Swiss-Prot record:
Organism: Parvibaculum lavamentivorans (strain DS-1 / DSM 13023 / NCIMB 13966)
Disulfide bonds: none
Region (2-C-methyl-D-erythritol 4-phosphate cytidylyltransferase) location: 1-226
Residue ranges of the region described as 2-C-methyl-D-erythritol 2,4-cyclodiphosphate synthase: 227-382
Keywords: Isoprene biosynthesis, Lyase, Metal-binding, Multifunctional enzyme, Nucleotidyltransferase, Transferase
The protein's name in its UniProt record: Bifunctional enzyme IspD/IspF
Gene name in the database record: ispDF
Binding-site list for a divalent metal cation: D233, H235, H267
Length: 382
């Protein structure tokens, strides 16, 4: 049985406020759409994933989807959701899937069990829709005043995926051409296709506003696996009149000696990220014996580690780095360092701490021979 996923991501939703379309906004360090695509691309029963996008979003889609398996070339949507789904179905027709799951690109927290339940329902039904049976009391109103209670035993709150036998939903959309249906179950019902309801998931929310992104982040924090990594680095002082620390150029009466720019702070954070995902250390990825990295800015190393973390399904929750030295003074530069680290990792500055301490004159740092950095990074997987 060949199962395809059709992800509808051609909208321009204005409720999320100014900026990128909601499906390309960052959710805990990753674009919303990437999380949606990954949920289907990583599902063992899904064979292909086709995305319907807005013509202006080709570059954004490429950036958001890079490296994911099973993805077909996206197609452009139309002026309505119905038009966009029709375009996607016509494109999938050449691939001849048996089943198709149609899902909102702005629902990034769809779970594997709900996907599986929708597919399973198609063994006995032409269509299936995820949804939530209502538990709250439902009441009609009359001019703002409470009126009669509505029986809730037949009421569901609709979600996606909406899953169908492929030929049935393609024919239904062709029959509905020019109509104004708001979802695919409506299209199916109009064509006489019977659709079963499948219990969905409370966490399968649709991102329509900034508040929804905050709610989704809370859900991810609650449900994800926590990983912690520890990094430590040392560099000695040498000739120079500045040092690089945590991505910031700091004036000093000496420089730091190293193969790259000797930024001990970023090196420690890089090792912490790599350690949290079990990817070795900075030397494995950027060996000091390679002249390519001579004098290289250390932000390259941290950005690479962050990319590996993203590919492993992880996101950075927070970073805590301690710089150990007598001089230079870190306090005046700490805020700029926090901002630079946050920018490299694509997280909020409030998730980054930079602080300094001394060894009270003891050891090589106490003698002013060099400095050290220690970093702890917390990642959330899931």
């Amino acid at each position: 049985m060949k199962v395809a996923a059709l992800i509808v991501a051609a909208g321009r939703g204005s409720r999320a406020g100014p900026g990128a379309p909601k499906q390309y906004r960052l959710l805990a360090g990753q674009p919303v759409l990437r999380r949606t695509l990954a949920a289907f691309a990583n599902h063992p029963e899904i064979m292909t994933v086709l995305t319907v996008i807005h013509p202006e979003d080709a570059s954004a889609f490429e950036a958001a989807s890079g490296g994911l398996p099973k993805l077909l070339e996206p197609v452009f949507g139309g002026s309505t959701r119905q038009d966009s789904v029709r375009a996607g179905l016509e494109a999938l027709n050449a691939d001849a899937p048996d089943l198709v799951l149609i899902h909102d690109g702005a629902r990034p927290l769809i779970s594997a069990p709900v996907i599986s339940a929708c597919i399973a329902a198609l063994s006995t039904h032409e269509g299936a829709q995820a949804g939530l049976s209502l538990t709250d009391t439902i009441r009609r109103t009359d001019k703002g005043m409470a009126a009669e209670t509505v029986a809730r035993d037949t009421l569901w709150r609709a979600q996606t995926p909406q899953a169908f036998r492929f030929n049935a939903i393609l024919d239904a959309h062709r029959q509905a051409s020019g109509g104004e249906h708001t979802d695919d179950v409506s299209v199916a019902l109009a064509a006489g296709v019977k659709v079963a309801m499948v219990e969905g998931d409370q966490d399968n929310i649709k991102i329509t506003s900034a508040a929804d992104i905050q709610q989704a982040e809370r859900i991810l924090m609650r449900s994800g696996e926590t990983r912690t990594g520890l990094g430590y680095d040392v560099h000695r002082f040498g000739p120079g009149d500045y040092v690089w620390l945590c991505g910031v150029k700091v004036p000093h009466d000496a420089g730091l000696v190293g193969h790259s720019d000797a930024d001990a702070g970023l090196h420690a954070i890089t090792d912490a990220v790599l350690g949290a995902i079990g990817a070795g250390d900075i030397g494995r990825h950027f060996p000091p014996s390679d002249p390519k990295w001579k004098g290289a800015p250390s932000e390259i190393f941290l950005a690479h580690a962050a990319k590996l973390a993203t590919e492993a399904g992880a996101r950075v929750s927070n970073v805590d780095v301690t710089l150990i030295c007598e001089l230079p003074k870190i306090g005046p530069h700490a805020d700029a360092m926090r901002a630079r680290i946050a920018d490299i990792l694509g997280i909020e500055k409030g998730r980054v701490s930079v602080k300094a301490t001394t060894t009270e004159g003891l050891g090589f740092t106490g003698r002013g021979e060099g400095l050290a950095a220690q970093a702890i990074v917390t990642l959330i997987i899931g």
